Amino acid sequence: LELANGLRIFPGMETDVAEGGHILSIGPLEAILELNRRLEPHKEKETFPPLADLLDLLEQYPVLVGCAHPFRAPGRVPEQPMEQLRRFHFLDLNGKDMPQDRARTQRLTQALGKQLAIPVVAGSDTHQAVQYGCISTVFARGCATVSELWGEMQAGRYTIEVADQAPFQV
């Protein structure tokens, strides 16, 4: 879906894991809807899936998998075994964290991305309309499909832009 202002919207969801933290998946609408249905029994804190189990499930679908705001407390995803972390396609540099401690958030997230050799892209963590656009990933080329999006991420053909008003948006 592409909006009049050029914003592309790809289906996705965020899933809580037992270790603490949030895992993102982006892919075809049918895959996201089916994953959401299959994860229905695991949406309460005491039933969150372990990271390894969730990644096993996600690997059965044509989705990109990322770690949302990896260094936000109380998340513990970066402390998980390296063999699990290497299963991520990308990390999220999250807009909600930027106004609080931008230097730390960027330093830690970029360092983990480099260690894992995966892209770090922006996520606005938009739960309310005012938060939209506090941080953006701007791609050099248009992406109409998830595979095109992944190709541009892998090629590094994007910039991350933080809005001047971000501290007031989140």
Segments (PLM) and residue ranges:
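Active-site flanking residues adjacent to catalytic metal/cofactor-binding acidic residues
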Residues: 13, 68, 124
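Binuclear metal-dependent hydrolase catalytic cores centered on His/Asp/Glu-rich metal-binding motifs
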Residues: 23-62
